[in-house]
Amino acid sequence: MLKNRVKELRARHGYSQTDLATLIGVTRQTIGFIEKGELSPSITLCLRMAKHLQISVDELFWLEDEEELT
């Protein structure tokens, strides 16, 4: 499962879901689904989010350790 820090970093930068969505060209609902882990974004969206949140993609998104699943 893909984990992320989008909500945390979005808030740190003072962006609403709508603000971030507008910056990267998606809907507010898309940001909500990504934050809840219900949608895995494309690499293009990952790169856009990382750019606007001033963080590397691997610090923003990571795969949940498979050992935690067992």
Tell what function each PLM region has.
Residues 38-48, 67:
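Short, basic-rich loop-to-helix N-cap that marks the start of a DNA-contacting helix
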Residues 26-39:
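Recognition helix of helix-turn-helix/homeodomain-like DNA-binding domains
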Residues 6, 20-21, 31-34, 60:
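Conserved hydrophobic/aromatic packing and binding residues within compact polymer-binding modules
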